[in-house]
Amino acid sequence: MLFRSYKKNLIKFVTEVKTKGATPILVTPVSRRKFKKGVFSDSHGVYPEIVKEVAQKENTLLIDLQAKSADAISKQGDEKSKQWFNYVAAGTNPIVPDGKSDDTHFSETGAMKMASLVVEGVRELNLKGLVQNLKR
């Protein structure tokens, strides 16, 4: 049920953007950090595929951030990839005295890395009027 409304809403957004004369770009969800026995594992299920399907059906540009981020996180490995996420050791931060292990939300370093992957995707699409305005 949720999948259908997700797809329906994506199509609605794409249609509305095109109606206004703009160029929509769909982006698959960024990967969460999930390793099983040291091997990176996807945790988004069908959502990235729905985005790809809508992009194809609606003839819309796509940045596959799920694939790009999964590759980057996997290459970093189980331990080193933690620096990209909100990991706080117990006793090091008064706001979270017991520490925190968050494999969904990014640290500043991780957010910058994910943003660079989006920029990479925009460059690959080679959109005139957009690419030349990118700083990196």
Model-assigned labels for residue ranges:
Residues 12, 28-29:
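Short glycine/proline-centered loop/turn elements that form peptide/ligand docking sites
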Residues 8, 12-15, 19, 46-53:
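Alpha-helical scaffolding segments of alpha/beta enzyme cores, especially the outer helices
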Residues 6-9, 13, 114, 118:
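Alpha-helical packing segments of well-folded alpha/beta enzyme cores
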Residues 18-25, 57-61:
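Loop/turn elements at helix/coil->beta-strand transitions in domains of secreted/extracellular proteins
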Residues 29-136:
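Catalytic His-Asp segment of secreted/periplasmic serine-dependent ester chemistry enzymes
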